[in-house]
Amino acid sequence: MMQFILGFTLGNVVGMYLAQNYEVPNISKKIEAFKKDVEAKKKPPE
């Protein structure tokens, strides 16, 4: 039981630390860039 509590607590502390310090990628910007890329490929070359 003690091992479970210690592991659970350590996991929570590490998770909170990573959540505060991890730079989350901006997904909406990546989607917009992907859409522009697809639109550029759809247009026939002139």
Swiss-Prot record:
Domain of life: Eukaryota
GO cellular component terms attached to this protein's record: mitochondrial inner membrane; mitochondrial intermembrane space; mitochondrial outer membrane; respiratory chain complex
Pfam families assigned: DUF4535 (PF15054)
Tissue-specificity statement: Widely expressed. Expressed more abundantly in brain compared with other tissues such as heart, muscle and liver.
Deletion phenotype: Morpholino knockdown of the protein leads to various development defects, including smaller eye, abnormal head shape, malformations of the jaw, cardiac edema and a delayed yolk sac resorption. Most animals die by 1 week of age.
Transcription recorded as keyword: no
Localisation per UniProt entry: Mitochondrion inner membrane; Mitochondrion outer membrane; Mitochondrion intermembrane space
InterPro entries, A to Z: STMP1
Mode of membrane association: Single-pass membrane protein
Record field: transmembrane: 7-23
Record function comment: Microprotein involved in mitochondrial respiratory chain complex III (ubiquinol-cytochrome c oxidoreductase) and complex IV (mitochondrial cytochrome c oxidase complex) assembly. Required for the formation of mitochondrial supercomplexes (SCs). Also required for the activation of the NLRP3 inflammasome.
Family, as annotated: Belongs to the STMP1 family.
Protein's recorded name: Short transmembrane mitochondrial protein 1
Source organism of this protein record: Danio rerio (Zebrafish)
